[in-house]
Structures are given as C-alpha cells and as structure tokens.
C-alpha cells in the first residue's frame, strides 16, 4: 500500500471500463462492428467497450494513426453512434510511425537511429515528441470521442524492438529507453485525457516502476490459463494490473472456465482479433457465459469501490492471498525424487498457492481449469460462505470443492457485504437500485464509493462514501442500514435493498 501511494495511488478507471470488453477481428469495418453490437444486444450479452485492432489504421506495422477510409468512411459519425449506444471505442496501436502518416515529417527529427518494421521510433522521453504525437492523436482520435488505447509492442525486455547500439535524440541509451517506453507512452496518453477532464482505461504491453497510477492493464500474447492466474496474482505485489483475456479455447469447458476467470479481473475482455470468437461461440455454455458476464455488471459497484480503495489507500483490487489478513498457509516444500539424469541433486520443489485470489475487500475467487472435477481451496482465518448460496463453506482450513453446478468456487468472508447492481446488458449515468448482500452471521460494515464515474473531479473531493451496515441482535436477527452523508451527491444508486444470504 505504501509503495502504491508513494507512486500516486492506484488508478481509478472510469466506471464504464469495468463493464464487458470485446475486441473485434482486425479487418472489421464500421458496419461489421455495428452488426456485432446488434448481436450482443439481441442475445442479451453486456457490452461496454469495443476494441478495434490494427485494421482501423490506413496502414499498420508501422502505423499512421489515421482511419482507413474504406473500412471507416465516416469515423466521427461512427464514434458518435457508438457513444450514443453507450459503447466506448478502444484503439490498438504500436509506437512505430509509418512514412505514410501525415505526422511523419514532424516527428522524424525526434526519432531513433533505427526503425522497427520500417517505422520511425519516437523518443517519448522528449516533450517535443510527446506534443507532436499527442496532437496527432487528439486530431484523429480523442476529439472524435475515442475513449482509450491498447498500446502494443512496447515491451522492451530485449533487443527485439531496437538494438542496443540505437541512439535517440534525448541521449538516453537504447536499452534504458526500451525499458521505459511503455511507461512513457502511458504518461503521454493519460495527459491528453486529463486535459479534457476525462478518465481513460486501456491496455499496455509494458510498464515499469511507478506506473500503478496510470489507468492501463498489462497483457501479452501468452495464453496458458494457469500462468494467466499466476500473473494476475503476482501483479498485486508490484502494484500493477493484469488481465487474463480470453481469446480462444479447444472445448466449451475451457471457454467457460476462462470466461469465469476474466470476469473477476481488472478488465473482463474477449479478444477476438484473430479468430472472430464470440461469447456464444460454444452454444452449450452460452447461458453460463451470459450469466457470468451479467454478474460482472452486477459487481460494478463493488469493483468500483475496490478500485477507489486502490486509488485512495493503495490496496490492490485483485490481490494475492498472501496480502489477505488471516492468511497464514506457508509454501510447502516437496522433496524431488533422485534421478541420475533429470534430478541428480534431489532438488526440492516449493508448492505455493497461486491459483486463488482476493477481489476487493470480501470476495475470494478460486478458478477452475478445464478437466478439473474438484479442487482444494485455502480459506483464511474466520468463517467463509458460498457467494451464490450463502451457505457455510469452512473456517480457516483447506477444503476440497466438488462443484455441483457450472459455477467456479467464490466465497465471501463472515460479515462481508457485497453491493450489486441489477443484471443488465447496458448501463449509463443514471441511478440504479442496489441489492446489498450480507453473508454469515457477524455484523458487517462497508464503505461504498460513488462519484460521477468519468471525470477527475473526485481528486477535488467530489465523491461520496455511503456507509452500509448490518447489525445482528442477541437473537440473531439482522438489520441493514444505508447512511448517505448529508449534502453529498449520489450518482449511481436510487435505493438500497438488503438481502441476508445466510439464514
């Protein structure tokens, strides 16, 4: 927490950023996108953000950052239509400037000695380069209503991008600039939106120390499901965000399990850029996918509060079990079997809990993987209850779960309060009734966060904390109460209805 706060606090995304994202195939046209949005609506699937992949550029690899006139003949009209339908647009880009871009001649003096994919590499450490590029982005994207970016191929862990011998006008060594590049691009683009008093939310391939304050979520082309969970968990130790995005699956079971995981992550996204998959690609689990996607929308008040705690207090919204109070299970050491070739020194292997995590203050998520019929879940100290039923699950112990339905194991701590919106495929700026769930038999308190959901006015004090409390008398009777501060505005909630899940 102190590290996150030292670097400016965690990012508070716009409320729409916590909805469901869908990245469309790279060569989609404006009409293709509209049909895709229509199909989401027809099938009752939530959709908040459409991601456009490289084909929106007139040329990509390297990029022009200008619209392809054949696929998007009226980009301003298209962007407005999407906004009118409560759909934000997020644009893919990489840093490398095409000679066919109108910005090419302006940026050329502020680029490196070597190209990448024959594209010029802007020196984003220089204010002059940042201004030239962001002026171009404003003209062709931001001023049209584009809500954010997916910034690819700026992960400079080796010389795959540009060689160590490359030089840049700032004088920063090539190796250092590779490692700074993702952070510098985040800084430059966030500044554009701050100037408009609009929050953005997007994806980035790389970051470095101190980028937790930027509203970008890390991703890459890796696709092992278990590895994705490990990355999601480990990100919390360094104050950054990670998404285990869904792209494709071999079976409907794997499809469902990946979707269930991503809907409890910082960005709930299906990335169909290459193969055109849809949430309903596997018909036998379509209803289950719809259910978890709608639950994602229901959880937005809870998730938004978790991100507010990230911004104000430094608490990661998704975090490793080691960061949960009362969690004390030590890593187990298993002796390796002596083998003259494979293990000549009988090396030991440490088994750690890296397949379950906390979301927000009260929720524990234990994903399932394709082929699993049961799994072990480590419950921290105190009593824990099933999210879906409210039934007692265990107390400070390791339990074995055999799912009776298609849900993944999700638990809530004793006294935990979970605020939920209605299940809806679209949401806007209006107020919605809130279902306030309470689990277990202990009294509970929860500080629900609210603001306008889109601007930086919360930094000036324009936000509200609603105190949700549940008391339990001597006979075990529960009573819920919501206290709104006098004189404070409420943006998102019209009423508070308490539901006691554990009777």
Which ranges hold each PLM region?
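Accessory, solvent-exposed terminal regions and/or long lumenal/extracellular loops of proteins
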Residues: 407-503
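Catalytic-domain carbohydrate-binding cleft regions of carbohydrate-active enzymes
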Residues: 1-406, 452-455
């Amino acid at each position: 927490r102190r590290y996150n706060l030292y670097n400016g606090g965690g990012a508070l995304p716009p409320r729409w950023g916590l909805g469901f994202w869908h990245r469309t195939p790279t060569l989609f046209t404006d009409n293709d996108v509209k049909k895709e949005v229509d199909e989401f609506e027809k099938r009752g699937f939530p959709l908040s953000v459409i991601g456009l992949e490289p084909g929106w550029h007139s040329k990509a690899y390297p990029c022009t950052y200008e619209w392809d006139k054949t696929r998007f003949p009226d980009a301003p009209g298209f962007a407005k239509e999407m906004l009118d339908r409560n759909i934000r647009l997020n644009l893919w880009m990489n840093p490398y400037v095409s000679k066919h871009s109108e910005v090419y001649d302006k940026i050329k003096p502020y680029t490196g000695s070597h190209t990448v994919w024959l594209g010029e590499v802007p020196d984003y450490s220089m204010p002059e380069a940042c201004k030239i590029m962001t002026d171009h982005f404003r003209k062709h994207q931001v001023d049209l209503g584009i809500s954010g970016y997916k910034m690819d191929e700026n992960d400079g862990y080796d010389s795959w991008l540009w060689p160590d011998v490359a030089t840049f006008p700032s004088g920063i060594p090539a190796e250092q600039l590779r490692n700074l590049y993702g952070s510098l691009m985040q800084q430059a683009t966030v500044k554009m939106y701050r100037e408009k008093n609009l929050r953005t939310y997007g994806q980035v391939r790389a970051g470095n120390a101190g980028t937790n304050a930027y509203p970008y979520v890390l991703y890459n082309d890796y696709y092992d499901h278990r590895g994705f969970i490990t990355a999601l968990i480990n990100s919390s130790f360094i104050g950054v965000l990670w998404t285990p995005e869904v792209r494709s699956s071999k079976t409907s079971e794997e499809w469902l399990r990946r979707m269930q995981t991503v809907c409890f992550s910082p960005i709930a996204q299906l990335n169909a850029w290459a193969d055109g998959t849809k949430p309903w690609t596997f018909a036998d689990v379509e209803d289950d996918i719809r259910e978890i996607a709608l639950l994602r929308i229901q959880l937005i008040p809870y998730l938004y509060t978790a991100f507010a705690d990230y911004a104000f207090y430094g608490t990661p919204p998704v975090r490793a079990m080691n960061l949960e109070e009362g969690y004390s299970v030590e890593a187990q050491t298993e002796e390796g079997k002596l083998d003259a070739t494979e293990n000549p020194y009988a090396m030991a292997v440490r088994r750690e809990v890296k397949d379950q995590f906390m979301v927000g203050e009260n929720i524990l998520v234990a994903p399932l993987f394709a082929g699993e019929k049961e799994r072990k879940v480590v419950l921290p100290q105190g009593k824990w209850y099933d999210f879906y039923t409210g039934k007692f699950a265990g107390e400070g112990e390791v339990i074995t779960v055999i799912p009776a339905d298609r849900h993944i194991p999700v638990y809530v701590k004793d006294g935990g309060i979970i605020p939920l919106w209605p299940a809806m495929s679209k949401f806007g700026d209006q107020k919605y009734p809130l279902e306030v769930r309470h689990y277990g038999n202990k009294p509970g308190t929860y500080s629900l966060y609210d603001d306008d959901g889109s601007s930086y006015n919360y930094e000036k004090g324009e936000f509200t904390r609603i105190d949700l409390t549940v008391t339990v008398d001597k006979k075990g009777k529960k009573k819920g109460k919501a206290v709104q501060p006098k004189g404070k505005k409420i943006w998102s909630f019209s009423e508070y209805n308490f539901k006691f899940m554990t009777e």
